[in-house]
Design a protein with these regions (language model features):
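Conserved alpha/beta-hydrolase catalytic His-Asp/Glu region
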Residues: 127, 134-203
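Active-site loop/oxyanion-hole signature of alpha/beta-hydrolase fold enzymes
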Residues: 3-16, 40-48, 52-98, 255-258
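Flexible "cap/lid" loop of the alpha/beta hydrolase fold
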Residues: 101-146
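Active-site glycine-rich loops that stabilize anionic/oxyanionic intermediates
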Residues: 31-34, 97
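Acidic catalytic loop of the alpha/beta-hydrolase fold
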Residues: 215-219
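Catalytic histidine-centered segment of alpha/beta-hydrolase-like enzymes
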Residues: 241-254
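Short beta-strand/loop motif that positions the catalytic acidic residue
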Residues: 204, 210-212
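Short beta-strand element of the alpha/beta-hydrolase
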Residues: 22-31
C-alpha cells in the first residue's frame, strides 16, 4: 500500500489483507538498514486476525524512496505523518531496534495518536560502537556483516531456522546488503545520538510492552529491564533469542504482541 508522507511515496505492507482503518490499526517499524519484511511472520497473522496492519518501509528503505532521516526525532515525526496520510486518528505502534526508538519518540511527541506501544529489542540510550560507525562509513560490507552476526544469537548462526532450508544469518545479510548507500550509517548515527530525558520516558502514559532477547548482545537484557522500569506501568517480556527475535523466535514474539494488543 502506498501513501504520500512528507512529500514522498511511502510503502507499507498490509499483511495480505486490504487495509481497513475502521479496524484497530497496528503500525510496525523496522530497524537499521532493514525493511517491512522483518515483520513477515507477525504482520500477516495480525492482519488475518482483526487488525489493520501497516508494516512500513521508512524513507530510503525497502520500497520507500527519499532520504534517510538522520535523527530519531525526524523518524518519529514521519510516523505521525504516516498516520495523518492514512487518516488514522490513533494506532498501536510496534518498533524493532531503531524502529523502537522511532515509535517511542512518536509516543513522546504525539501521545494522543498512540493507543499502545510495543518496544522490541530496545535500549535507551542505544549506543553504537565507534568501530561499527566507522565500518558503516568506510566499509559498508563489513558493517553489514557486523550487523548480521551481532544481530543473532549463536544458535541462530548455525543454520538454525524455523523455516526448513533457510539460514537466518544469510537472510539478514542479504537484506541489509540491499540497502542504499549511506543508509546504514545514517541509521546508526540516529540511534547513537538519541538521548531523551528521563522525564520524557516517565511521561509515556500509554500501555507499553518491552520485549527483550535474553541472548541479545546489541540491546542487552539489562537495557530492556531498565527501560521497562523507566516507563510507568510497562510490561517486560523476556524471550530466549538474540536481537532479531521476530525471526529467531517468531512464534514467541507473535504471542507477546498478540496478547499485548488484545489488552
Amino acid at each position: 500500500m502506498q501513501f504520500i508522507v512528507q512529500g514522498y511515496p511511502a510503502f507499507a505492507y498490509t499483511g495480505g489483507v486490504a487495509f481497513d482503518a475502521k479496524l484497530p490499526v497496528v503500525v510496525m517499524v523496522h530497524g537499521a538498514a532493514m525493511d517491512h519484511s522483518v515483520w513477515q511472520w507477525q504482520s500477516r497473522y495480525l492482519a488475518h486476525h482483526g487488525y489493520a496492519v501497516l508494516a512500513v518501509d521508512l524513507p530510503a528503505h525497502g520500497r520507500s524512496p527519499g532520504l534517510a532521516r538522520e535523527r530519531i526525532e525526524e523518524l518519529g515525526s514521519w510516523i505521525v505523518g504516516l498516520l495523518d496520510a492514512g487518516g488514522i486518528e490513533q494506532a498501536a505502534l510496534v518498533g524493532h531496534s531503531m524502529g523502537s526508538l522511532a515509535v517511542l519518540q512518536a509516543a513522546i511527541a504525539a501521545p494522543q495518536r498512540v493507543r499502545r506501544l510495543a518496544l522490541v529489542a530496545c535500549a535507551v540510550p542505544m549506543a553504537v560502537s565507534d568501530a561499527f560507525l566507522a565500518a558503516a562509513k568506510e566499509a559498508p560490507p563489513v558493517a553489514f556483516d557486523m550487523e548480521a552476526v551481532w544481530g543473532h544469537a549463536k544458535n541462530s548462526q548455525l543454520a538454525s531456522s524455523p523455516v526448513p532450508g533457510a539460514t537466518l544469518l544469510g537472510a539478514t545479510r542479504a537484506l541489509n546488503g540491499r540497502s542504499r548507500n549511506g543508509v546504514l550509517e545514517a541509521d546508526l548515527r540516529a540511534c547513537n545520538a538519541w538521548r531523551p530525558a528521563q522525564e520524557a520516558l516517565k511521561s509515556v502514559a500509554v500501555p507499553t510492552l518491552v520485549v527483550c532477547g535474553r541472548r541479545d548482545v546489541m540491546t542487552p537484557p539489562r537495557a530492556g529491564k531498565a527501560l521497562a522500569a523507566a516507563i510507568p506501568g510497562a510490561k517486560l517480556v523476556m524471550l530466549e533469542s538474540g536481537h532479531s527475535m521476530m525471526v529467531e523466535a517468531p512464534r514467541e514474539t507473535l504471542a507477546a504482541l498478540r496478547d499485548f494488543l488484545a489488552g
